[in-house]
Curated annotation (Swiss-Prot):
HAMAP family: Ribosomal_bS16. Keywords: Ribonucleoprotein, Ribosomal protein. One of its GO terms (biological process) is translation. It comes from Shewanella oneidensis (strain ATCC 700550 / JCM 31522 / CIP 106686 / LMG 19005 / NCIMB 14063 / MR-1). GO terms for molecular function: structural constituent of ribosome. InterPro entries: Ribosomal_bS16, Ribosomal_bS16_CS, Ribosomal_bS16_dom_sf. The keyword Ribonucleoprotein applies. GO terms for cellular component: cytoplasm; small ribosomal subunit. Belongs to the bacterial ribosomal protein bS16 family. Gene3D superfamilies: 3.30.1320.10. The keyword Ribonucleoprotein applies. This is Small ribosomal subunit protein bS16.
Amino acid sequence: MVTIRLARGGAKKRPFYNIVVADSRNARDGRFIERVGFFNPLARGQEETLRLDLARVEHWVANGAATTDRVAKLIKDAKAAA
């Protein structure tokens, strides 16, 4: 099953997440199909916290991709900000 989920990056104690479309059987930070955005929970000052390609997200959801709870909330936040 294809899922839209967070893949962790960044340094120790400084998380940075890529929002990726991946097969659910692959590892969290492993192989993915497409990167559709990023989420930086510790953004400071003028740094961007969230960037999401909503058109691609809608495409994948329409084709049966499931979203995790956290990604669903981020999508909702991105739509409200747009």
